[in-house]
Structures are given as structure tokens and as C-alpha cells.
């Protein structure tokens, strides 16, 4: 990789004086026939992939003449390793998916992806019109854009889910819960008495101990209690900022919010009272729904119907964390133009189509296949997928996730969502979410690499404390915190603040 990085640095230096996007590469004439290779993560090549991709290229001729695409779908489990080999060997790849398996910052530093800023300005205006102003900041480093986030749901309010039959019996006071969890105050130990009373009632009236989702404990309580009412965003480890705080002051999650430790009092008290089941450490999953009475959930329109289908009972949800924000850290699914692409201008023209309504028929075909064979239309912009399993399964003849190849909110809605889902996510969720105050910031973890590794290892060692099963939890928390401090947790906060300050001055 050192050789590759050296080549990338030399190439960047050679292009420093170039004003042409694509590092001064010759622009492709419109009548030149171009074949682009596009690699992405998914279930791999499916039974009908070659047939669909052939039809896609026929359709593409109407949108981008003299262009064909050679799609290569790599199974998710193999994607990171295969991409690194392709990139190191400078294989003939023009467009590459950048998923959660890869460290985006590291890939950029190694020269894997092209700076797309000027290409987007020249060829990407259709997609830019559809994006929120902050979207391309998610994949920007030092003011340069290295990938296009595959636009989908980028934020979500958090809530709790209980069986409707328990609401009907009056076992939980929803009005009281909605008054408390409204995002206007710091949540305290006393506020969770609402849930304790509910679980105690279940314990008294049902034969089995109440099963509380472990995700509800950690996401529904631990990530709320004693923390800023406006929300907090983790930069790394214990270094956090308050959502919307334009000063970008970095706080220490371990030491600056003592009220957060009330979480451990709550879960240990509940465990001792029998309202947290005794096998929670051995059985933390929440996929078996029959005995569960309290879950963590995403608060989205129509979610209750989805959860009802999943757990085979009617559900009622209510918000426990109404503040939604978009993290600066980037999207988990993006698309980049590779540094070795011979036709970056044509690649960008294609990405503009796949990320805008202008090219929605192309994206829908690449995602869902052929009408009548892989799906049937149920409305102007809605379909019923005809595969054996859910979309993205290797057992289907065709069908890829809509977030893999472009703007997911320009694809058909399926039977898994309601009509108008895309508009709802775009307007009611994404555009109403608060963008991070750190949009455009990139943390260089090199100066604190050892400290981060130490922190993560120690937190993993003491993760069992989250379940409430440890009688001497206070002693163990002190022991954990002493190890964190010795491992450099203070240095993490100091270094992050230093970098944030430097970034703010450079804006």
C-alpha cells in the first residue's frame, strides 16, 4: 500500500496546476463509445443479473448515448478485501460503492477515489437539486467531495413500543410519557418511573417475567438519561458535542454528565425486582416477540404496522427521544469515482442520472429488474416485489437493495412501505433533522490511535454492566473509569478539541 500511496501523492502533485476535473484527464467526446465498470456490494451476481443488466444498457442508450455499464456485484462479506485488491492493482474500475465495511477516510488518504467536486459542479446539477444542502458534506474531506452519499433515510427519532392490549388495559400512562419525553428537559431517574410502574404491573398480572429489549435499556435509557436535552453526538469514544452547539465544545461523556450514571441504578434495581428477566445476558436478542412487553424502536410513520407484523401482535409506539440530527460522520452507503477511471466525466454523467428523477427508470431497473418478471406495478410509483424472499437476498432471481446504486428516494416504493414513503422520509425526516455542527470536519485518529484502541477494549470488557446483573456495579464502574483514565481517555477529549478548534478557524 505504501507504493500505491506514493503514486497517489505524486499524481496529486502532478495535477496541482490542473483546472480540469478528473485530474486533467482528457474529456470524453459525446460520440466516443465508453464502457464503464461499476462494482458494488450486495448478494452477488443473481440468476437474472446478466439479463437485466443487458436490458439496462439498452435503456441507457436513450439517456446517455454511447455508454454501457459492466456491473459487478460483490457479496458484502467479501467486499472490503476484494475492493482493496482491485484498488491496489489499479484494476479497470470506474465507479465503486463505498460501504460500511471500508474506512472512507483511509481510502481517500490512499488515493482510492477521485476528487469529484468539479465533476459534480459540471455534470451533477440534476442530483444536487434533489439533495439537502448538507448531504455532500458527509463525504467531503478538506472541502473536497470524494463520493456521493446514496440518499435514503439519514436520521430517525427514537421511541418505545408496547403491546396495544396493555395500553387498552391502562397498564402504562402514555399521556404522562409524552409530557416527559418531549425533548425539552434533561431526563432523570425519576422520569423512568413510568416504565417501572408498567413493568411491575406486567409482572403482577402475567405468568412470565416481563421481557425488556436490551436495546430499550441501552438505546432508550442509557443514551438519554442525564444527557443534554438537545441531544449529543459522539465524535469518537468519550468525546462528544451537544447537537446544535455552534461553539463545538467537546465534552467527556464519562466525566461531564454524572446523571448518566443513574442508568446503572435503574437497571440494577429493575433486575433485583424481577422486572428484567434473569437470562438477559444470555438472550439479548429481541427477534422472538411473544414474551416481550417493551422494545426500542424507530419512530416512523407506519412503523407500528411493521412491528405488528414482525411480532404478531398489535403495537403502540411513543417517542422517548424526539431530537433527530444528521451526524457529520457520513453515510454508510456511498458511490465514488475511482482514481484509475479513464472516463470520469462519463461516470459522473451516469451518477447524475442514477441519483436524480431524471434517471429514475434506470435506477429502478438496476434495483428491481423487469416489470412482470421480477415485480408488478401497484401504482404509478409503487410495486410489489415478486422474489422468493426480501429484496437483497441471494435466493431471488433478481433484486438489489435500493440504497446500493443511487438515490433510494427516487426508486419505487414496495409492499414493505406505504405510498408516499419516499416523500415522507425526504420532507418529514431528513429535511427536518438538524445537521451536525461538525459537517465537513474530519477527525485524524492517528495521534490518539492507541488511546482509542484502549478505550474500546475497556468498554467491551465492562459491557456486561449494561444489563443490570452485577450486584457490585458501583465498584466495577469505578474500576472501569480508572482504567479508562489510565488508558488515555482525557487525551482523547483534548486531542479532539484541538482538531475541532483548528477546523473551526479554517472555515
Language model segments and positions:
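Extracytoplasmic/secretory soluble proteins
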Residues: 2-3, 10-15, 19, 23-507
Amino acid at each position: 500500500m505504501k507504493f500505491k500511496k506514493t503514486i497517489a501523492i505524486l499524481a496529486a502533485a502532478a495535477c496541482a496546476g490542473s483546472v480540469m476535473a478528473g485530474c486533467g484527464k482528457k474529456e470524453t467526446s459525446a460520440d466516443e463509445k465508453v464502457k464503464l465498470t461499476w462494482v458494488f456490494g450486495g448478494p452477488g451476481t443473481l440468476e437474472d443479473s446478466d439479463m437485466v443488466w443487458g436490458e439496462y444498457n439498452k435503456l441507457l442508450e436513450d439517456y446517455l448515448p454511447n455508454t454501457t455499464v459492466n456491473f459487478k456485484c460483490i457479496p458484502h462479506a467479501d467486499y472490503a478485501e476484494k475492493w482493496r485488491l482491485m484498488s491496489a492493482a489499479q484494476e479497470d474500475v470506474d465507479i465503486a460503492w463505498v460501504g460500511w465495511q471500508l474506512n472512507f477516510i483511509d481510502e481517500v488518504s490512499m488515493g482510492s477515489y477521485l476528487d469529484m467536486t468539479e465533476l459534480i459542479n459540471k455534470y451533477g446539477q440534476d442530483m444536487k437539486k434533489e439533495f439537502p444542502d448538507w448531504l455532500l458534506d458527509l463525504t467531503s474531506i478538506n472541502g473536497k467531495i470524494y463520493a456521493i452519499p446514496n440518499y435514503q433515510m439519514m436520521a430517525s427519532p427514537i421511541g418505545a413500543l408496547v403491546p396495544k392490549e396493555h395500553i387498552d388495559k391502562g397498564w402504562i400512562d402514555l399521556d404522562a410519557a409524552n409530557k416527559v419525553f418531549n425533548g425539552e428537559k434533561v431526563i432523570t431517574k425519576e422520569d423512568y418511573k413510568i416504565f417501572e410502574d408498567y413493568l411491575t404491573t406486567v409482572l403482577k398480572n402475567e405468568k412470565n417475567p416481563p421481557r425488556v429489549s436490551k436495546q430499550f435499556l441501552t438505546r432508550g435509557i442509557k443514551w438519554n438519561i442525564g444527557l443534554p436535552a438537545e441531544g449529543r453526538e459522539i465524535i469518537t469514544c468519550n468525546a462528544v458535542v451537544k447537537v446544535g452547539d455552534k461553539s463545538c465544545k467537546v465534552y467527556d461523556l464519562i466525566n461531564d454528565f454524572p446523571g448518566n450514571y443513574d442508568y446503572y441504578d435503574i437497571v440494577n434495581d429493575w433486575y433485583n425486582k424481577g422486572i428484567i428477566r434473569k437470562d438477559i445476558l444470555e438472550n439479548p436478542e429481541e427477534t422472538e416477540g411473544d414474551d416481550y412487553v417493551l422494545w426500542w424502536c424507530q419512530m416512523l410513520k407506519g412503523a407500528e404496522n411493521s412491528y405488528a407484523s414482525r411480532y404478531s401482535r398489535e403495537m403502540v409506539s411513543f417517542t422517548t427521544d424526539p431530537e433527530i440530527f444528521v451526524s457529520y460522520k457520513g453515510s454508510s452507503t456511498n458511490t465514488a469515482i475511482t482514481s484509475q477511471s479513464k472516463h470520469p466525466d462519463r461516470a459522473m454523467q451516469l451518477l447524475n442520472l442514477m441519483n436524480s428523477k431524471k434517471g429514475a427508470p434506470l435506477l429502478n431497473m438496476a434495483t428491481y429488474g423487469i416489470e412482470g418478471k421480477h415485480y408488478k406495478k401497484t401504482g404509478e410509483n409503487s410495486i410489489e416485489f415478486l422474489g422468493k424472499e426480501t429484496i437483497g437476498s441471494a435466493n431471488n432471481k433478481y433484486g438489489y437493495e435500493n440504497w446500493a446504486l443511487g438515490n433510494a428516494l427516487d426508486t419505487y416504493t414496495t409492499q414493505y412501505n406505504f405510498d408516499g414513503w419516499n416523500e415522507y422520509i425526504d420532507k418529514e425526516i431528513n429535511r427536518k433533522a438538524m445537521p451536525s455542527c461538525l459537517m465537513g470536519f474530519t477527525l485524524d485518529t492517528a495521534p490518539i490511535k492507541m488511546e482509542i484502541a484502549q478505550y474500546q477494549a475497556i468498554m467491551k470488557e465492562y459491557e456486561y454492566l449494561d444489563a443490570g446483573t452485577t450486584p457490585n456495579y458501583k465498584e466495577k464502574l469505578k474500576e472501569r473509569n480508572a482504567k479508562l483514565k489510565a488508558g488515555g481517555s482525557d487525551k482523547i477529549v483534548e486531542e479532539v478539541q484541538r482538531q475541532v478548534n483548528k477546523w473551526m478557524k479554517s472555515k
